[in-house]
C-alpha cells in the first residue's frame, strides 16, 4: 500500500480593510475574503480609526486590533466562522468601553 503525501499550504493575509458593513481581507493567493462586520461585534462597535489600526500576527495567519482587543484568524474566516465571544463577555467589554469613552469626553466616569 502506498500513500500520497499532499502538502496543504494555508493562505495568509496581505492586507485588511474594514468599513461599517464589511471586513475585507486580501490573501497571498489572490483571493479576497469579504464578511459582514456584524460577525465580529467588537469591529462593528469600533470607530473608523480603531478599525484602521490592525496588524498581521502569526506571519499573516491572523489579524489583531490592539485598541479593541480583537483577534481573527484567516483559517476561521475561510471556514466561515463568526466571533465565538459570549454575549456576557461582549456586554462586559462594551460597558468598560463606554466607561472609558465617558471618562475621555467628560473627564470622569458616569455614575
Report residues per predicted region.
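Motif-centric detector for short Cys/His coordination patterns
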Residues: 1-111
Amino acid at each position: 500500500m502506498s500513500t500520497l503525501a499532499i502538502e496543504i499550504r494555508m493562505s495568509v493575509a496581505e492586507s485588511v480593510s474594514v468599513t461599517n458593513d464589511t471586513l475585507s481581507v486580501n490573501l497571498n493567493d489572490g483571493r479576497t475574503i469579504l464578511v459582514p462586520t456584524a460577525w465580529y461585534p467588537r469591529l462593528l462597535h469600533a470607530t473608523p480609526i480603531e478599525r484602521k489600526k490592525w496588524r498581521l500576527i502569526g506571519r499573516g495567519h491572523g489579524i489583531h486590533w490592539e485598541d479593541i482587543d480583537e483577534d481573527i484568524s484567516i483559517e476561521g474566516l475561510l471556514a466561515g466562522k463568526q466571533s465565538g465571544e459570549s454575549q456576557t463577555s461582549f456586554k462586559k467589554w462594551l460597558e468598560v468601553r463606554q466607561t472609558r469613552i465617558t471618562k475621555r469626553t467628560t473627564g470622569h466616569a458616569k455614575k
